Amino acid sequence: HFSMNHFFRRQGATVLASEVCRASIHKKMNAQVWVDNLRGRNPELGRDIDTPQELIPHIGIEKHATFTPGGERMELIYMGHGHSPGDLVIYLPERKLLYAGDLVFSGMHGRCKTCDFGGILPILDRLMDFPCDTVVPGHGSPVVGVGTEGIAIYRDYLVTLQERIAELVTSGVSMEDAKTKFDDWKYFNWGRPQLVHTAIEHAYKDFVWRSRFEHFQALHEDKD
């Protein structure tokens, strides 16, 4: 998806992304200022980049594409907005292997700044229907030999996170205080502990925004 640590194309390969992701990169990165910004933030990565066009994927996939590299079927499927607006998964049916990307984290916390907490759960439910033995997450170790168990665990992570956030917000607990209310959460000690409060913050903001939006909708429906 669109993130500084997720794309480059100077290695000679044809780069594919969902069309939503490709268009986002094209819109935001097709300016020299982004190249200059990248060089300033990470000189080692940015030193070999000459033009913004080098950052844009070659091909955008609208919904679904099938490739057969080496004679093996590989399906690229756009899932919608879960972790980010451009979520794309790769499925190898013959191996029962699913590359889930950042739709799934395994045993570690992650940044959920662009996550649609309402949209990602139905997407995870769809992924649970994929016949697979191994799931490769966006972050964390592959979940091997247990089918979609890794997806189910991350789904529970998100559900329990949102349930507690809902309780805290409804009780009037501030976002900063909410970060102190998760020490007994069963996923609190996952890897990358420096990001647990980031995940809580993003979930808190998402819940508040959705609550306000639903309230706004209800007011307009009453007027109609």
Task: Give the label of every model feature segment.
Residues H1, H83, H139:
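Histidine-centered divalent metal-coordination motifs
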Residues H1-Q11, G86-V89:
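Di-metal (Zn2+ and/or Mg2+/Mn2+) metal-binding site signature of metallo-dependent hydrolases
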Residues T14-V20:
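Short internal beta-strands
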Residues V20, D102-L103, H139-S141:
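Active-site metal-binding loops of divalent metal-dependent hydrolases
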Residues V20-M79, P85, E94, L124, ...:
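Metallo-beta-lactamase
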Residues R73-P131:
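Active-site-proximal loop/helix segments of hydrolase catalytic cores
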Residues L97, G119-V173, D177, K181:
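Divalent-metal (often Zn2+) His-rich catalytic cores of metallo-beta-lactamase-fold enzymes
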Residues T170-D224:
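C-terminal regulatory/interaction regions
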